[in-house]
């Protein structure tokens, strides 16, 4: 009696996670593939004068500009052609699923080494002990208010922080107690087993383009390869750039 080998059915990849930088950040303007120039919108204390005083024509606050460059993200997939799996589709869906991580890691660390501002250029506000996230968030928001003189600020946290923030009502939807947006991203690094770092920055912009996928079938060894690539950019107003560490119990 002959036996028939049943073919498995390839499952569809789940949709990329919602939220994160790509779900919350402001859309980068057209032409972002040439790079973005972000003026330091908030870095300038307003001058209070009597309205009858004649002002001098000398600007007190000179505009500073930060430059952010685009970068590439790539993923790949390979398998025997005998598997009959769509490697081109696999590579593209893998790219879609991991783009958020790549964009967030670039914002946090300038992992590509482009010289763009990142969280690592921020100013430390110290360490808060015993999981006191209320004090940590309050300290961050006050620092942002003082540095930006009223300009918008955005709060950032790794996934590990989300449960702590939600329990203390510091993550209402995606808003802080003052109404600033939170970005909780899978790509933000955790500092250690007992330390969670939170950041605050100026406004954030991000964009990615559609994937470009290359597929190659090596018939000599039946190897099916696919490479998915896309361009991305992430930028923020670095006038506000602070971080604070919070100590927590070690995970099991």
Residue positions per predicted region:
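Extended, solvent-exposed, turn-rich assembly/linker loops in the middle of proteins
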Residues: 116-182, 186
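Flexible, glycine/threonine- and acidic-rich loop/arm segments that mediate assembly and lattice contacts
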Residues: 1-126, 163, 168, 225-252
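Sequence/fold signature of self-assembling virion shell proteins
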Residues: 174-252
């Amino acid at each position: 009696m002959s036996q028939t080998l049943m073919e498995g059915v390839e499952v569809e990849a789940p949709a990329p996670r919602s939220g994160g930088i790509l779900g919350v950040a402001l859309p980068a303007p057209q032409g972002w593939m040439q790079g973005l120039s972000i003026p330091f919108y908030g870095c300038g204390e307003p001058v209070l004068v009597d309205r009858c005083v004649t002002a001098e024509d000398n600007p007190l606050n000179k505009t500073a500009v930060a430059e952010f460059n685009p970068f590439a993200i790539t993923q790949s997939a390979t398998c025997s052609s005998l598997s009959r799996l769509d490697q081109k589709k696999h590579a593209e869906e893998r790219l879609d699923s991991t783009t958020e991580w790549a964009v967030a890691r670039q914002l946090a660390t300038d992992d590509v080494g482009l010289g763009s501002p990142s969280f690592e250029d921020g100013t430390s506000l110290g360490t808060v002990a015993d999981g006191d996230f209320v004090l940590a968030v309050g300290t961050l928001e006050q620092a942002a208010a003082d540095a930006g003189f009223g300009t918008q600020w955005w709060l950032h946290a790794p996934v590990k922080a989300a449960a702590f923030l939600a329990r203390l009502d510091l993550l209402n939807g995606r808003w802080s107690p003052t109404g600033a947006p939170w970005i909780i991203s899978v790509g933000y690094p955790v500092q250690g087993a007992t330390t969670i770092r939170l950041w605050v920055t100026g406004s954030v912009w991000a964009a990615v383009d559609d994937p470009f996928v290359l597929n190659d079938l090596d018939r000599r060894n039946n190897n099916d390869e696919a490479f998915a690539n896309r361009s991305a950019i992430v930028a923020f107003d670095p006038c506000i750039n602070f971080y604070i560490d919070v100590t927590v119990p070690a995970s099991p």
